[in-house]
Amino acid sequence: GQEEINQIMLDNFIIAMDPPKHMKYRKVVRDAFTPKAVGEMEPWLRQHAKDIIDRVAARGECEFVEEVAAELPLMAILEILGVPQKDRKQFFSWTNIMAFADDPDIATSLEEAQAASFEVIAYAMALAAEQRKNPTSTAVQALLNGEVEGEKMSEELFAWMFILIMVGGNESTRTAIAHGMRLLMENPKQLQYLVDHPEDISQAVEEMLRYNTAFIAMRRTATQDVEWNGHNIKKGDKVILHYHAVNHDEDAFGDDAMVFDIHRHKRIPNLRGEIRSFGVGEHFCLGMSLARLEMNIMFEEIIPRLRNAKLAGDTTYMRSYFINTIKAMPITFDPQ
């Protein structure tokens, strides 16, 4: 039943592991996501970002989430995991169903979400067998050959790692790109500033990450009694980490922390170091360098080419207590 499935996920998901087990597993996959490994993908990412905008530029309108925001993160994660690009739409659908089982438009039931995760597990196991015979993906090789305490990674654990990288690696970045675009359209002066000053795009990306974090919250369990800032937290208590709260902290970001401002870095020089969108501590986001690079490249392509972008129709959101996702966001712009 559901209890057993939850337990299997907790046992196998690296985000739910404690030290020292967590670091042993994290090390296995870490090398595929180092700044150096990610940096080598830059030409590939730029070419695909250009192609994505090429596909919509002449039309003067698009559904920004599926046609633009979702494309590059999904393509990149499939490339890293050695999955053929032709399977991309299938993974877009599976990812939505697994991450948003609670949304009636996406999945009709929890069973449907479980079915999607089992399909991905079956796919991952077949991919593992194929990659053992015919290695093309460095990340998959690292996972398959990685050893934890002298034992090779099991196919089952590989499959759970695959799901985590797949969902974590495309859903969150798609959300950050969609929110970033929405914020720029709601602040046309700031958008125009970036058209005129493309060198400031990378700092604008940090403000996007701060202002609308992809993940809403994570939950942790206290392992011992602790007093923190006058609060008594008992062993076994659940502690919720709210990313939006910490990213809007006036002490860190100034009195206008509730305002979206791409110039914030001029007042808060260490903006990048202060934001907690990627978490903090030993569980910090493995894909941080990849997400930042994808966002920078996408906005460097979007901003000069999709001019006078405006919201056209309703922006709809996923029903989720976990991910702050825009489901659909139709926009118009000057045809190119």
What is the meaning of each model-derived region?
Residues G1-Q336:
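Cytochrome P450
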